[in-house]
Amino acid sequence: MNTHRLICATAIALALVGGGSSHAASQPSKYKGFTARVTNPWYPLKPGSVYVYRGVKDGQPSREVMTVTDRTRMIDGAPCVVVSDLLYLRGRLEERTTDYYTQDPRGRVWYFGEKTAELDRNGNIKNTSGSWLAGVRGAKPGIFMFTHPSPGQSARQEYYKGEAEDHFRVLRLDVPVKVPYGSFGHALMTKEWTPLEPGVIDHKFYVRGIGTVLERTAKGPLERNELVVPAGS
């Protein structure tokens, strides 16, 4: 995927969005008004912000460092903020990912792709599976966060057939959650799944003004990620 070049799309791909148990196509026909300045209170991406998470992945102690850069990139006609994500397992850098987010005029956060690379012990790229960019080879952007999430809302976060097909549904808005960074009484809880991993379900927890504070497996191999350093650090 690191050799992909952007192509111009003549029609904007549909993303499935809905409320209750149904999905509805609601992607705008154009990206007019989209901005790389992501200010959604449930997933703010202020340039310079750093989030550090610790947990368990693939049975190993993990550390993830997510940095919102001051860089932007046009993807399929939409201006996106560039976010760097580094995953360490047992202290060694295992995966390097660049994510692309944008916000529509209604305040919803959209996910427009990622460039991901698994690294070997020498730091060389051994796998780029899962990489995709909206508008390239049939890949479609998706909604990552609603402006005013409510239980039952659901969306497809990404679509690149066979590589990236994540979905999420809003479950609750009043969940108490405790992580190393602090305790919160009204977290947003979502359910995430993908048809590419049948039987695996994750729960994510978001706090207004911060973003993701906890991710854990609800069904499937144990994984957990907890916020230890807040945004702006």
Across the structure, where does each feature detected by a protein language model lie?
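Bacterial N-terminal signal peptides
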Residues: A9-G18
